[in-house]
Amino acid sequence: MLNISLCVDGVWYDAINDLYCIPKKFNVGIAEPKTNYVQVPYRNGSLDMSEALTGITYKNREIAIPLLILHPEPLAVYDLVSNRFNGKKCKIRLFESLESQSEYYYEGRIRVGTLLTNDSKWEFDIFMNAFPFKMRDVLIYVDGATTKSITNEGIDTVPTITVETAMQGTWNGESFTLAVGIHNPHSMVLKTGANTLVVAQGAGKVEFAEKRL
C-alpha cells in the first residue's frame, strides 16, 4: 500500500492518518536537462553551450498523485486538503509501503485537482511543480576537537555552518577559521562523495540539503 506525507509551514501530514486519503499511484517526471545550442555560420551542426557557464542544469519536474478519499465525508476531506495545501509551497515524501521510511523529499508548489466521483468512490489529484532534485536534510553537530567524515551522495553544494564557539580546523585538507555566527563559506564546498571535516577547536553545527536526481 502506497503512502505519502506532505509538509507545509514546517508541519508534516500523513496522507492516510491525517488527510484520510490513500495514493493510487505515483507519477514522478524526470528533471529534463536545460540545453543551449547555438547555430554557427559555416559550421556543421550546432555548438552545444549547455554546460558552458555552470555545468548541467535542469528544469523543474512534474509530480502527479491521484488520491482516493477514505473518509465517509469526502467533501470535508477535499475542503481540508484544498485549504491546507492548494497553491502553497510544500515538501512531499513518497513511501512504497506503510512500513517503508524515506528521508528524501521533493519540494515545490502544490495544486489540488478537481474532485471526481467514480462508482461511489471519491478521488482527486494533487500536482507539484517540483524543484529538479529530491533532497535530504543533513545535520551534524561538532563540539571540540573531532573529525567528521561527511558523505554527500548528491551534487556539489555549500553547507551552512552555524558557529557557537569560534572554530578552527581543516575542510578536505584546507585550513579555515570561522567566527561566531552563521556562514556559507564558498571555499568549503561539499563535494560529491566523501568529505572530511577536522575541528581543532570550537563548537557548532553543519547543515546541508543533499540534492540528487
Question: Can you describe what each PLM-predicted range is?
Answer:
Residues 1-213:
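Extracellular/virion structural assembly segments
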